[in-house]
Amino acid sequence: MKVYAAPFEKFVNLADARLGTKILSVTDDWFADANRLFQPTPAVWKEGVFDDNGKWMDGWESRRKRFEGYDSAVIRLGVAGTIKGVDIDTSFFTGNFPPSASLEACFLASGEPDENTAWTEVLPSVELQGNSHHYHEITNDQAFSHLRFNIYPDGGVARLRVYGVPHRDWSKVSEDEQIDLVAALNGGRSIACSDEHYGSMSNILNPGRGVNMGDGWETARRRTPGNDWVIVALGHKGEVEKVIVDTLHFKGNYPDSCSIQGAFVKGGTDSQIETQSLFWRELLPSQKLTMHAEHEFAEQINAIGPITHIRLNVFPDGGVSRLRVLGKVSR
């Protein structure tokens, strides 16, 4: 079972490049492109690799500052949301990491920040160490769409992870519109699973189809009785009309079959929901799966009314690239 370094790591990484996160402006990224901060894969070290500007580094690295000031990057998050915590990762930056960093944020319904934008400090200046992860909980309950990441005075950071709950204005979604209720961009989040040895449970909610086998959720080979499962909180309560289970790239390691349970959960913690899910109603009866394919189920869906959570069961184990739960929102 995967061990999380911080509890908030189970939330969606709002700064994931796969969600569309990008740099809008940066004071300096001479040595390494600031957009590398958002790559979903861990940073790597490439021994002896240099480019025209110096040693190739997997992250954002600015020049040595020879005047007053500090470096900063303005970031548009792929999806706006409430931030639960951040990880400032300086992996492989040893003699060139910033001594400290801070984070500011703002929310814009449209457009990009300018000189008149009011920024809110969500993480005061914190000390950094080389080749290390720095986990910090954020207690601000506002939703934010943009960040300003400050490093003092210069240097390199490998990755910036911004974990939180995606925000969507559901008042703009028609009751007649069919929408993916579990999509990360719509606020869906994976909250618990039996195992995620080879791939994160959050991957199945990402947009688009998986780029490879690592861009999905895959469990270890099960050597004990039972089956693997993942619990997902819908972005908004709704009634399910169709489910898509995609096993793209999973050929010798796809599940033999799957089923889905659902429930309208009114309270409780994530750990309590894990136990309750055993007794949820059957939304999708057991269905056979095949390798490397999208499986659509509509006629097989049971009408169980509005729900807030689903539990995807895979038998006995294996990998799933994407999960789509299509339906209409309930007010």
Swiss-Prot record:
Identify a single GO molecular function assigned to this protein.
allantoicase activity
> Which domain of life, per UniProt?
Bacteria
Q: Which residues form a coiled coil?
A: none
Enzyme Commission number(s) of this protein: 3.5.3.4
Kind of enzyme, top EC level?
hydrolase
Reactions catalysed, semicolon-separated, are: allantoate + H2O = (S)-ureidoglycolate + urea
According to UniProt, this protein's pathway is: Nitrogen metabolism; (S)-allantoin degradation; (S)-ureidoglycolate from allantoate (aminidohydrolase route): step 1/1
GO biological-process terms attached to the record = allantoin catabolic process; purine nucleobase metabolic process
Which Pfam families would you find in this protein's record? Allantoicase (PF03561)
Keywords in UniProt for this one?
Hydrolase, Purine metabolism
Has the keyword Hydrolase been applied to this entry?
Answer: yes
Q: Which family does it belong to?
A: Belongs to the allantoicase family.
Name of the protein described by the UniProt record: Probable allantoicase
| Species for this entry | Pseudomonas savastanoi pv. phaseolicola (strain 1448A / Race 6)
